[in-house]
Design a protein with these regions (language model features):
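N-terminal transmembrane-helix/juxtamembrane module of multi-pass inner/ER membrane proteins
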Residues: 1-51, 94-122, 199, 203-214
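Hydrophobic, aromatic-rich alpha-helical transmembrane segments
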Residues: 34-37, 72, 76, 80, ...
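Hydrophobic alpha-helical transmembrane segments
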Residues: 42-62, 130-135, 142
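Lipid-exposed faces of alpha-helical membrane segments in multi-pass integral membrane proteins
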Residues: 49-56, 85, 89, 93, ...
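Membrane-interface helix-loop junction between the first two transmembrane segments
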Residues: 54-77
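Membrane-interfacial segments
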Residues: 59-67, 100-105, 191-203
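Membrane-interface loops
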Residues: 70-144, 148, 156, 200
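Membrane-embedded catalytic cores of phosphoryl/pyrophosphoryl-handling enzymes
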Residues: 117-214
């Protein structure tokens, strides 16, 4: 646990969800240590799960090489292959938004005890990059593999909640992060779906393993 408070030079920032943030961090402070440890580990390393799900989605989307008449197979594989790039675009949009909005972390402006150490000044809060990435990954999986999405969607919500629990984000930071992740990734996946049928041509090139199993 780390006690934090804002020096006078930071000003006095107030948001509508200050009370909710303080209540969550107080609950985290009073919770058993093992629970806080698990939430902290998920908050720090949980994005790796989304990377694994994206990889699994691409692997599952590739049709067998023998399925020569499955025209949609390479298209599905190509769509899954573009998914990580879509998530990266969502992250880039989030990073630009952070630099423009320049909202300070709640642990820098409120006197609270947090599970994680408060990020340094200049590490902006709005929107939550973790929430953006998780929501974008869940969205692209909804477009490519509903079974994996059934795991990714609740995992994205848990990722967003964990960022508030450990004290590094306001609730509105993660809420906006989820919205940004969906709004950026969904139209990009729609556009990618229109171009995906061109992937059939890759089956006749050395790039065939990208869209079909050997």
């Amino acid at each position: 646990m780390t006690a934090t408070g804002a020096p006078a030079l930071l000003g006095d920032d107030h948001w509508f969800d200050d009370g909710l943030y303080s209540a969550v961090t107080e609950l985290a402070h009073r919770s058993p240590g093992p629970l806080d440890t698990m939430v902290s580990l998920w908050s720090a390393y949980g994005l790796a799960l989304f990377g694994a799900l994206l990889l699994a989605g691409w692997w599952r989307a590739r049709p067998p090489a023998s399925a020569t008449r499955d025209a949609g197979g390479p298209a599905r594989a190509m769509l899954a292959l573009t998914a990580p790039a879509v998530v990266l675009v969502a992250f880039a949009v989030s990073s630009v938004a952070k630099s423009l909005l320049r909202e300070r972390r709640p642990c820098q402006t409120l006197h609270v005890v947090t599970v994680e150490a408060c990020p340094a000044l200049g590490d902006w809060s709005l929107p939550s990059n973790h929430a953006v990435i998780a929501a974008a990954a869940a969205t692209v999986l909804l477009c490519t593999d509903r079974r994996l999405a059934a795991l990714a969607v609740p995992a994205a919500l848990l990722m967003a909640a964990s960022r508030v629990w450990v004290g590094v984000h306001y609730p509105h930071d993660v809420a906006l992060g989820l919205v940004v992740g969906v709004l950026v990734s969904w139209p990009l996946m729609v556009a990618a779906r229109r171009a995906a049928p061109l992937a059939g041509r890759l089956r006749e090139t050395r790039l065939r393993p990208l869209v079909a199993r050997r």
